[in-house]
Each structure stands twice: as structure tokens, then as C-alpha cells.
Regions:
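Glycine-rich phosphate/diphosphate-binding loops that line cofactor/substrate pockets in enzymes
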Residues: 49-65, 93-97
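Short alpha-helical segments and helix-capping/turn motifs at coil-helix boundaries
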Residues: 48-52, 84-88, 148-158
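N-terminal amphipathic/basic leader segments beginning at the initiator methionine
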Residues: 1-43
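An acidic, phosphate/nucleotide-engaging active-site surface
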Residues: 111-172
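Short internal beta-strands
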Residues: 97-108
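Residues at the starts of beta-strands that form the adenosine-phosphate
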Residues: 63, 99-101, 164
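Structural beta-sheet core signal
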Residues: 66, 102-104, 167
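Histidine-anchored nucleotide/phosphate-binding helix
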Residues: 74-95
Length: 172
């Protein structure tokens, strides 16, 4: 019997399998951790691949919406990325913190409560920046068109009020 352990929420799920049922295991390539997430993020914002630095895309005083994954994608560690990004927007781009709205992209999941939102964006950011849960059933969603497959696209009502929309995310 072999046990497979998966992080889930604040805990883990253990799945015991008879070794005869296991056809193989797929492991990702090891990627060393960044020495400093804020420094690595700053370098990426200053030197994005094929684009000018973020500070050249923005103007002081603009409104910015940050769209971030919900707690179901917390393995992306938004809590490590959002604080230095908000600081960069303030310090390098001249975007006041009261001009930043974080939209938590919940998909069809229920929105997080205050504790989850504070975990996601950190207490420091939660106390300084507006954080809202996206609700896919909200009556004020804004229609923006259709996809190539004729699927209607509706977005959070906060996004059209922003001069810039920055989406953070990762693929599982």
C-alpha cells in the first residue's frame, strides 16, 4: 500500500493505493525557489518579456483593478505576490492605494469571507486596498461581447471603471 498526500485547504488529503493499481508517477521538473519574491517580481515588472516596464503602461493617478484567483488556487501564493505588486503600483507607477481594487475571481465558487480574503491578499493589503468578491450571478455584470465560439462574455462591474486591469493567475 502506498499513500499519496495532497495539500487541500489548510490540511491534506491522503489517498492510499495498492501499488498494483499505480501505473506510474509523473513528477514536475525541480525549479529553485526565488531568493526574494519581491525582488523577483520587481525585476519581472521592470523587464517583462517583449513588453515595456509596467510603469510605462500606467499614468500616475489612474485606477487599477487587480484580478486574482480565489482560495481554490492559493497554491499560486497570491499573498506573496500582491503586497509587492501594490507597493510597486504606488511607488513606481504613482497609483494611490485608494485607486486600486482587487477583484477576487471566484468563478462559480462562493466568495470568500473576510478571513479568507485577508489570507489571500494579506492583512496589510486588505486594510489599505478595496477587495471585492466576484459574483458570477450578480445583476450588474457588464456584457463585453462574444468569443469566437459565440459564447457571451460578461465581466465584473468594477473592471470597466479601471484605467488598467491586471490579471494574476496560474494554470493548475
Amino acid at each position: 500500500m502506498k499513500e499519496y498526500r495532497f495539500r487541500y485547504g489548510d490540511g491534506e488529503v491522503v489517498i492510499p493505493l495498492d501499488e498494483g493499481q499505480v501505473l506510474g508517477e509523473l513528477h514536475g521538473n525541480h525549479v529553485p525557489a526565488a531568493a526574494s519574491i519581491p525582488d523577483t517580481l520587481r525585476a519581472a515588472l521592470e523587464n517583462p518579456i517583449g513588453l515595456p516596464p509596467l510603469r510605462q503602461w500606467t499614468k500616475p493617478g489612474e485606477r487599477v483593478a487587480l484580478v486574482v484567483s480565489d482560495m481554490s488556487r492559493f497554491w499560486m501564493r497570491q499573498d506573496k505576490v500582491i503586497p509587492p505588486l501594490v507597493d510597486y503600483l504606488r511607488d513606481e507607477c504613482g497609483i494611490p492605494e485608494d485607486h486600486v481594487t482587487i477583484i477576487v475571481a471566484n468563478g462559480t465558487h462562493d466568495g470568500g469571507d473576510e478571513k479568507e480574503l485577508r489570507t489571500l491578499v494579506t492583512d496589510g493589503v486588505y486594510d489599505r486596498v478595496r477587495v471585492v468578491n466576484h459574483d458570477c450571478l450578480a445583476k450588474d455584470l457588464v456584457y463585453v461581447g462574444t468569443t469566437a465560439h459565440d459564447t457571451a462574455v460578461w465581466i465584473n462591474a468594477q473592471a470597466p471603471h479601471a484605467d488598467r486591469v491586471i490579471c494574476l493567475g496560474a494554470c493548475p
